[in-house]
Protein backbone atom coordinates (compact mmCIF):
# COMPACT_ATOMS: atom_id res chain seq x y z
CA UNK A 1 0.00 0.00 0.00
CA UNK A 2 2.80 2.42 0.91
CA UNK A 3 4.60 1.78 -2.39
CA UNK A 4 1.41 2.52 -4.30
CA UNK A 5 0.93 5.83 -2.46
CA UNK A 6 4.50 6.86 -3.25
CA UNK A 7 3.96 6.03 -6.90
CA UNK A 8 0.80 8.16 -6.98
CA UNK A 9 2.75 11.11 -5.59
CA UNK A 10 5.33 10.76 -8.34
CA UNK A 11 2.66 10.67 -11.02
CA UNK A 12 1.51 14.17 -10.06
CA UNK A 13 4.90 15.69 -10.94
CA UNK A 14 5.39 16.43 -14.63
CA UNK A 15 8.66 15.65 -16.35
CA UNK A 16 9.52 19.34 -16.75
CA UNK A 17 8.84 19.96 -13.03
CA UNK A 18 11.05 17.03 -12.11
CA UNK A 19 13.86 18.39 -14.29
CA UNK A 20 13.53 21.75 -12.55
CA UNK A 21 13.62 20.16 -9.08
CA UNK A 22 16.64 17.99 -9.88
CA UNK A 23 18.46 20.82 -11.63
CA UNK A 24 18.77 18.86 -14.87
CA UNK A 25 17.87 21.85 -17.07
CA UNK A 26 20.50 24.21 -15.73
CA UNK A 27 18.48 25.10 -12.65
CA UNK A 28 19.84 25.03 -9.15
CA UNK A 29 17.43 22.37 -7.96
CA UNK A 30 16.26 24.70 -5.20
CA UNK A 31 12.58 25.36 -4.74
CA UNK A 32 11.97 28.45 -2.66
CA UNK A 33 9.42 27.96 0.09
CA UNK A 34 8.10 30.11 2.90
CA UNK A 35 10.72 28.64 5.24
CA UNK A 36 13.61 29.21 2.80
CA UNK A 37 14.28 32.73 4.07
CA UNK A 38 13.44 32.09 7.73
CA UNK A 39 15.89 31.46 10.51
CA UNK A 40 15.75 28.13 12.33
CA UNK A 41 15.48 30.06 15.62
CA UNK A 42 12.23 31.64 14.43
CA UNK A 43 10.73 28.23 13.72
CA UNK A 44 11.96 26.85 17.05
CA UNK A 45 10.25 29.71 18.86
CA UNK A 46 6.97 29.16 17.02
CA UNK A 47 6.88 25.45 17.83
CA UNK A 48 8.14 25.66 21.42
CA UNK A 49 6.65 28.90 22.77
CA UNK A 50 3.41 27.36 24.05
CA UNK A 51 4.50 23.91 25.14
UniProtKB/Swiss-Prot annotation:
Gene Ontology, cellular component aspect: extracellular region
Question: Which location does the Swiss-Prot or TrEMBL entry give for the cross-link Beta-methyllanthionine (Thr-Cys)?
Answer: 33-38
Q: Could you state one GO biological process linked to this protein? A: defense response to bacterium
Which domain of life does the UniProt lineage start with? Bacteria
Know the name of this protein? Lantibiotic lacticin-481
Any GO molecular function: signaling receptor binding
Q: Where is this cross-link: Lanthionine (Ser-Cys)?
A: 35-49, 42-50
What residue ranges constitute the propeptide? 1-24
Give residues where (Z)-2,3-didehydrobutyrine occurs: 48
Q: Which UniProt keywords apply?
A: Antibiotic, Antimicrobial, Bacteriocin, Lantibiotic, Thioether bond
Assembly, per entry: Monomer or homodimer.
Known function: Lanthionine-containing peptide antibiotic (lantibiotic) active on Gram-positive bacteria. The bactericidal activity of lantibiotics is based on depolarization of energized bacterial cytoplasmic membranes, initiated by the formation of aqueous transmembrane pores. Lacticin 481 is a broad spectrum bacteriocin exhibiting activity against a wide range of lactic acid bacteria and C.tyrobutyricum.
Give the InterPro entries listed for this entry: Lantibiotic_typ-A_Lactobact (IPR007682)
Its post-translational modification remark reads: Maturation of lantibiotics involves the enzymatic conversion of Thr, and Ser into dehydrated AA and the formation of thioether bonds with cysteine. This is followed by membrane translocation and cleavage of the modified precursor. It is established that the 2,3-didehydrobutyrine is the Z-isomer.
Task: Tell me what gene encodes this.
Answer: lctA
Per UniProt, what is one Pfam family of this protein? L_biotic_typeA
Amino acid sequence: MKEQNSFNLLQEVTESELDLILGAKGGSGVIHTISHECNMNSWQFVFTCCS
